[in-house]
């Protein structure tokens, strides 16, 4: 069915005409009843969607399928632990036994039970409120006994005048109805105390048979206490009654020591990472520069490497070369880059001296025959016609090896030396043995080509 989209002014009246054109398709024409008002209207445009076709209830059937999604929630076994959906019209449910309402009540009860256990209250909830309050106070009384150790020690002290000012009341269970208004004052923390028996047994009276002493509150006692209150402690006259409020600071000290405040934090923090970093010297250069070690350890390391240099050079030459001449060429060539280094150790010099004497002996002579026997195999392995390039440029590279380094020599780790790095990159483009054999002729570059042509 064709669909038309129109934009018309709100509050206007239009004539909608549906017709069929020449090709049989429906044609729509919307004509305003007042064309002049249409042009001058300030009302906003309203988008309309007009579907031309038979008047059938086709869009109604797709709406019933959305109701089937509600059945899946009953299938979930963990529905009691889930929050209700925001689109649910009846979040509490209608079922009294397994609905969300019953499960939410269970969740609330369980949360309250966990909260009470976390606070130290064990057991199930008591059904009546006033009973729980009285029982909780009775349970707390034995817990506070360790706080009252100091008053018991004071009862054992022999000094009699200290006890008369302290307003301590000894009441039996028979005399408890006499002070009903006293526990209403705001100091319910003082529980029952059982003093030692040997001090109070000779002076006991009939009302104090249960041997339980209840400490009175400091503000609840009258200025003149009854005679039965002072008799269990000590026999004293009524003249010591005025000083009680002045010397009553002792019980307040007994309650303070247990809830001590936490220790104060140290004024200066312990030495940590920041303190260790202050001890380290600042690294030279920008922060991205690699760490530069002190020059003292690096000056000691090169001689050990220079001793190992020729041996490593021989090993690499033998791996790469195909004959003895190539291995010897590596051995002669490798110590040369180490000459401009900072430290030329004495053990490496005896290895360098025969090489220099070999080239010096061949320099003044025009024929290679009077030279030492070590040069014999070298002459046999020079068949190429392009040996002039390497002997001319090799000594220049060996003499000017210090400037082209990207990093200072101290930065390289002890296992890698600048000379070893250059040696490892030299043999990349070697395709023939002539290049390595000509490296030996650094001392006399102009003599070897003539021998090959002769």
UniProtKB/Swiss-Prot annotation:
Phosphorylated. It is found in: Host nucleus matrix. Residues 359-368 have a biased composition (Polar residues). GO terms for biological process: symbiont-mediated perturbation of host cell cycle progression; symbiont-mediated suppression of host innate immune response; symbiont-mediated suppression of host translation initiation; symbiont-mediated suppression of host type I interferon-mediated signaling pathway. Its main location: host cell. Residues 55-98, 175-454 are annotated as: Disordered. Residues 190-203, 295-306 have a biased composition (Low complexity). The keyword Transcription applies. GO terms for molecular function: protein serine/threonine phosphatase inhibitor activity. One of its GO terms (cellular component) is host cell nuclear matrix. The keyword Lipid metabolism does not apply. Residues 317-332 have a biased composition (Basic residues). Residues 59-73, 177-189, 258-269, 281-294 have a biased composition (Pro residues). Keywords: Activator, Host nucleus, Host-virus interaction, Inhibition of host innate immune response by virus, Inhibition of host interferon signaling pathway by virus, Interferon antiviral system evasion, Modulation of host cell cycle by virus, Modulation of host PP1 activity by virus, Phosphoprotein, Transcription, Transcription regulation, Viral immunoevasion. A motif (PXLXP motif, interaction with host ZMYND11) lies at residues 350-354, 404-408. Interacts with human SMARCB1/INI1, presumably generating an open chromatin conformation at the EBNA2-responsive target genes. Interacts with human WAPL. Interacts with host CBF1; this interaction allows transcriptional activation by EBNA2. Interacts with host general transcription factors GTF2B, ERCC2 and ERCC3. Interacts (via PXLXP motif) with host ZMYND11/BS69 (via MYND-type zinc finger). Interacts with host EBF1. Plays a key role in the activation of the host resting B-cell and stimulation of B-cell proliferation. Acts by up-regulating the expression of viral EBNA1-6, LMP1, LMP2A and LMP2B genes, as well as several host genes including CD21, CD23 and MYC. Activates transcription by acting as an adapter molecule that binds to cellular sequence-specific DNA-binding proteins such as host CBF1, SMARCB1 and SPI1. Belongs to the herpesviridae EBNA2 family. This is Epstein-Barr nuclear antigen 2.
């Amino acid at each position: 069915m064709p669909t038309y989209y129109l934009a018309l002014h709100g509050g206007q009246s239009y004539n909608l005409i549906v017709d069929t054109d020449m090709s049989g398709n429906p044609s729509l024409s919307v004509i305003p009843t007042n064309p002049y008002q249409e042009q001058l209207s300030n009302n906003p445009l309203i988008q309309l969607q007009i579907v031309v076709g038979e008047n059938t209830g086709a869009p109604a059937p797709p709406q019933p399928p959305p109701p089937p999604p509600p059945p899946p929630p009953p299938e979930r076994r963990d529905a009691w632990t889930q929050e209700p959906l925001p689109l649910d019209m009846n979040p509490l449910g209608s079922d009294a036994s397994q609905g969300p309402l019953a499960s939410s009540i269970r969740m609330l009860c369980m949360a309250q039970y966990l909260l009470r256990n976390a606070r130290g209250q064990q057991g199930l909830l008591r059904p009546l409120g006033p009973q729980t309050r009285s029982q909780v106070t009775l349970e707390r009384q034995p817990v506070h006994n360790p706080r009252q150790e100091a008053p018991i020690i004071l009862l054992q002290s022999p000094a009699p005048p200290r006890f008369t000012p302290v307003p301590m009341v000894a009441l039996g269970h028979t005399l408890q109805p006499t002070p009903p208004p006293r526990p209403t004052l705001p100091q319910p923390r003082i529980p029952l105390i059982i003093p030692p028996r040997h001090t109070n047994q000779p002076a006991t009276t009939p009302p104090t048979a249960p041997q339980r002493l209840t400490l009175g509150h400091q503000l609840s006692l009258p200025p003149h206490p009854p005679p039965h209150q002072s008799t269990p402690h000590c026999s004293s006259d009524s003249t010591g009654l005025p000083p009680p409020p002045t010397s009553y600071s002792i019980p307040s000290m007994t309650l303070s020591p247990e809830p001590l405040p936490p220790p104060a934090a140290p004024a200066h923090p312990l030495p940590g990472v920041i303190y260790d970093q202050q001890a380290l010297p600042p690294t030279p250069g920008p922060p991205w520069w690699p760490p530069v070690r002190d020059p003292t350890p690096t000056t000691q390391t090169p001689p050990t490497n220079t001793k190992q240099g020729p041996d490593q050079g021989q090993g690499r030459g033998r791996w790469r070369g195909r004959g003895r001449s190539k291995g010897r060429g590596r051995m002669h060539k490798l110590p040369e880059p180490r000459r401009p280094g900072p430290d030329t150790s004495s053990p490496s010099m005896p290895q360098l001296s025969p090489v220099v004497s070999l080239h010096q002996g061949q320099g003044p002579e025009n024929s290679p025959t009077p030279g030492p026997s070590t040069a014999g195999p070298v002459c046999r392995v020079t068949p190429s016609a392009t040996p002039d390039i390497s002997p001319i440029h090799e000594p220049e590279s060996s003499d000017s090896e210090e400037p082209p380094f990207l990093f200072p020599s101290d930065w390289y780790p002890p296992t890698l030396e600048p000379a070893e790095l250059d040696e490892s990159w030299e043999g990349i483009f070697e395709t023939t043995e002539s290049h390595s054999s000509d490296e030996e002729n650094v001392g006399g570059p102009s003599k070897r080509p003539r021998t090959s042509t002769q």
